[in-house]
Design a protein with these regions (language model features):
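Hydrophobic transmembrane architecture of multi-pass small-molecule transporters
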Residues: 178, 401-494, 499-510
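Transmembrane core module of solute transporters
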Residues: 8-68, 101-103, 142, 163-164, ...
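C-terminal membrane-cytosol helix-exit motif in multi-pass small-molecule transporters
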Residues: 174-191, 208-219, 237-251, 485-493
């Protein structure tokens, strides 16, 4: 049988799935640092070049829910081949593009092709290994999920500075070709052809919600959020789509996502924690480079190198997770991850303008360990009680909500950073004006012109200090929020240890 053949070849299949997932997650962040170079190369305006990122995010968000249904119709292997092949070819075309419209079109193709890689690879790995091996398997899979966004900015900065911005896309070619070759050689053909009714209304309303919501989150910072008519329209469309999708899910005979997913307490609770962990990882990674570059004067490449310890901590945690779960259990390991994550954010809340790189490196290392200890066990717990036939839809829903949660986290943190920076500056500025007694006396002694210049310099320093206070406040709040995960983790059920169930593909056909 095809499933038995995959069991015999699960080591090379797992390696290929890791490569495909890493390629997908890497591409979500690697292009960020190359945007200024792309902008200059294709002569685009600042608000235009951001579509290189926006187009990819929206295409992925729209296609991801549909990928499960397509894979059931044509088979997983064909879906993987089409997705990896399409993603690899689109990456090559992005690197060869000569103008902005070409890059945006090819990035859309990238997003459409790569949307299925993360959820589908997780589904296959859940099928290939027994429940008792899930901690080890999910730690391997989580490595690709976490190392992509961590390594992306560093690798992107190095490629851009030493080669060209085009290499942030060309880097996908060897990865994609290797994954294609291994899957073609070792993964068994499956016929697909499952006749599950397609919920057209559910898909259209979900697409409306996800597309409008992602567009709102991506465009918000540059459009003054709800000071812009565009954002109000996008928010209205997102709410309308969510409302209609909810009604359709509750009333349809065959909804787009099975209602049984919401009845599994472990899946719902684990998904909530997973969303938060993803938001924590991505939002921290989103603001730390700007902190190091704008306040500490690091270059883009230096800030990337300073993030390497997060990856090192993650790698160590991936090695430790199976051992800790075997000795302590999944929930204690997860709680240990909460402790490390909270400690790292508390360390970050003590950042200051005169700090050395040591604290950045240490806090990043601790956070890498903490997030790694949380990511793999929560993935295991989430699917421990979920019926095999629900895994394809479950992994797709989890990937989609994790992506949305990360986008929400990044947007909230960035919006809070702007408002808190302004608040911090205003509080500091209240105490220093041209009429401040000590300052007024000094101005009289050195002359009004020099005094005014000194006041401008002082206000610039106060702006930097106000922004520093904003970062510290945000990290402190994030540390507090991490602690709120503890009650939710405690109610999760321990996964049963049993023989591997039939794979989702076989369970669905029964």
């Amino acid at each position: 049988m095809a499933f038995q053949q995959d069991l015999d070849n699960r080591v090379p299949i797992t390696g290929a799935l890791m490569l495909a997932t890493l390629m997908n997650t890497l591409d979500g962040t690697i292009a960020n640092v190359a945007l200024p170079h792309i902008q200059g190369s294709v002569s685009a305006a600042q608000d235009q070049v951001t579509w290189v990122l926006t187009s990819y995010i929206i295409a992925t968000a729209i296609m991801m829910p549909l990928s499960g249904w397509i894979s059931e119709k044509i088979g997983r292997k064909r879906m993987f081949i089409l997705s990896i092949g399409g993603f690899t070819v689109a990456s090559m075309l992005c690197g060869l593009a000569t103008n902005l419209p070409e890059i945006v079109i090819f990035r859309i193709i990238q997003g459409l092709a790569g949307a299925s890689l993360m959820p589908l690879s997780q589904t296959v790995m859940l099928d290939l290994f027994p429940l008792k091996m899930l901690p080890r398997v999910m730690s391997i899979w989580s490595a690709a999920i976490m190392l992509g966004p961590i390594a992306g900015p560093t690798l992107g900065g190095w490629l851009t500075e030493n080669l060209s911005w085009r290499w942030v896309f060309f880097i996908n070619l060897p990865i994609g070709i290797a994954a294609l070759f291994v899957l073609q050689m070792f993964m068994a053909d499956d016929p697909g052809g499952r006749q599950r009714p397609f919920d057209t209304i559910g898909f259209v309303t979900l697409t409306l919600f996800v597309g409008a919501f992602q567009l709102m989150l991506d465009r918000g910072p540059g459009q003054d959020w709800f000071g812009s008519t565009e954002l109000w329209i996008e928010a209205g469309l997102a709410l309308l789509g969510l409302y209609l999708f909810t009604i359709q899910t509750l009333s349809a005979e065959h909804p787009f996502f099975p209602r049984e997913l919401g009845q599994d307490g472990n899946f719902v609770g684990g998904l909530t924690v997973n969303i938060f962990v993803g938001a924590l990882l991505f939002s921290t990674g989103a603001i730390l480079p700007s902190f190091m570059q704008n306040l500490l004067g690091y270059s883009a490449l230096q800030s990337g190198y300073a993030s390497v310890t997060r990856g090192l901590g993650s790698v160590i945690s991936f090695i430790l997770v199976p051992l800790l779960v075997a000795r302590l259990g999944a929930k204690p390991t997860l709680l240990l991850g909460v402790v490390f994550s909270g400690l790292s954010l508390w360390q970050m809340s003590r950042f200051n303008l005169g700090m050395s790189a040591d604290l950045i490196l240490l806090s990043g290392f601790v956070q890498g360990i903490g997030v790694g200890l949380m990511f793999a066990p929560i993935s295991s717990l989430s699917y421990a009680t979920l019926a095999p036939r629900l895994r394809p839809e479950g992994t797709i829903l989890a990937s989609m909500l994790r992506s949305l949660g990360s986008s929400v986290g990044i947007s909230l943190v960035q919006a809070s950073l702007v408002s808190q920076s302004a608040l911090g500056f205003s509080r500091l500025a209240e105490h220093v004006t041209a009429e401040t007694p000590g300052f007024a006396t000094g101005t009289a002694a050195i002359g009004a012109t020099q005094g005014t210049a000194n006041l401008a310099l002082l206000r610039a320093q106060m702006a930097r200090q106000g922004t520093m206070l904003a970062y510290d406040s945000i990290f402190a709040w994030m540390a507090l929020l991490v602690c709120l995960l503890v009650p939710l983790i405690l109610v999760l059920k321990r996964p049963p240890i049993q023989a591997p169930a039939a794979p989702a593909s076989e369970a669905l056909s029964e």
